[in-house]
Structure formats: structure tokens, C-alpha cells
């Protein structure tokens, strides 16, 4: 459906998004009508979807959506939890009417009930799970678009977009791609610049995981406060007693203070200096008496 135009060709960043979300991974079963969209089969039995055909059918579905004058006449449905958030985001971006959750039987056929609708186009997430709206659409001649896996039945489906409709990342990415292409064909956003809305906003989030993340964030915040409290504790205050008279309790020697008249400098204190000249003369060591040698020979003096 790209018509050979370069502007409509699949970009490398789009292929990387498809591969990261696992859009090319089908199921282990294959419907005979989905055989034309399968590229190969892996050794573990999982079929690989041809992403080029996925992109072509995505462009065809976007053209069908843009052809509806009133965006509210486009009805998007997802009974599975993995596609409900993506459906709501798609309806918010394109102005479509959404039915998330359980589809009430007779919405398209029973004119008596208050929830009766007459859409001009129907888009479903899973033909197997959303079989009731597909069946009712066939009764009132409403064209249908569906995200189909390798084992999805194509009965009552007019435009099948081959992709992995089981994983929440793949489903969210496909709705994001479809919304972006619709806005580009309408001229709302430019093809020259990337869309500021991230695909993460279309992904389904489990409430239990959200609760666990909030609990972990709260525990982390409490731990951080305790950690800061240990290091930012106020230092102990040391108070010094006030002393009125610093000389109180200090022993002062009773020395008479000599008074000097004003203008007279006080004399320097006397320093006791010894007179080295009055010291006795050093003894003459040469005149010192020599000790008498003791008689080592005894009484005998004649050695011969």
C-alpha cells in the first residue's frame, strides 16, 4: 500500500521498534488464511511474521480510518486487558469511540437498548477474543479491521494486520503505529519530525506491578530520609558557665607593690648576677701530690 513512495516506506527505526516489541513473533499454530503473512518457522515451532506485509496492511488500515469523515464513527474495541490502555490512548489521539472491557451483545443490532451504536468502521485487537462485535458487525455491514496473529480466524475480518497480538508490548506498539500513521495522513503531525508521544504510554501495566513499584519507591524514600537523619543530627551544644570575676578562686601572692610617681619609669627588676672574678683560682694540677707507690716487692730489695 506504500505505492513505491519513499515517504511511505518503513524506516529502520520502525523495524527496530517492531523487533524490540516482538511484533514479528507469531504463535506455534498457523491458520491457513494467515499462511500468506508468514515468513519462516523457527526450530522451536514459532512462526515468524513478515514485517513488510505488516507495514503494508498497517498503511491500508490507516487509509481506511482516514476515509471516515467523522472520527467518532470509528469504533475501537479490546476485551483483553493487554489492549485496553492502548485502545483508550488511540481513541484520545484520533477521536475515535472506544469500547474497553466487556462488549455488551446487541450494541450494533439491538436498537432498543441505550448503548446502541451505528459505527462506520470497527477495529478490534483480537478476532478470537472479540468475536461478538465482529459477528454483529457482519449483520449490519460494518467494515472491520483486526490485529491478527498466525492462529487467528479471519472470518468477518476485512483488513487483517498480521502481528503478535498476545504480548502487551506488541499490542501497544501496533496501536501506537496505527495512531501515528492516521495523524500523519490527516496532516496533524509531520513526517519530518518524530512524534512526541512515546510508545510506552500505550503499553499495558499490571496493577500489581504498579503497586510493587510504588511500594518500592516509598521504601526507598523512607530509607533515604533515615540515612539523611543519621548524618544530619544536630551537634551537641557545649555551654560554658558564665564567670563574673575571673580572679575569683585564684591565689594571689602577697607581694608589696611599690608606688612610683607619675612620669617616672619603673626601674627594671634586679637580676642576681654572680661575679666570676671572685671565684677561687683553679688549682695547679702539676703541683698536686703524687700518690706514693706501694711496696710491691715486699721486704726483699735485692733481686740478684
UniProtKB/Swiss-Prot annotation:
The lineage of its organism: Eukaryota, Metazoa, Chordata, Craniata, Vertebrata. The keyword Repeat applies. This is Small ribosomal subunit protein uS2. One of its GO terms (cellular component) is plasma membrane. The gene is rpsa. One of its GO terms (biological process) is translation. [DE]-W-[ST] repeats lie at residues 230-232, 245-247, 275-277, 284-286, 302-304. One of its GO terms (molecular function) is laminin binding. It holds the Pfam family 40S_SA_C. The record marks 115-116, 133-134 as: Cleavage. It is found in: Cell membrane; Cytoplasm; Nucleus. Acylated. Acylation may be a prerequisite for conversion of the monomeric 37 kDa laminin receptor precursor (37LRP) to the mature dimeric 67 kDa laminin receptor (67LR), and may provide a mechanism for membrane association. Cleaved by stromelysin-3 (ST3) at the cell surface. Cleavage by stromelysin-3 may be a mechanism to alter cell-extracellular matrix interactions. PANTHER family: 40S RIBOSOMAL PROTEIN SA (PTHR11489).
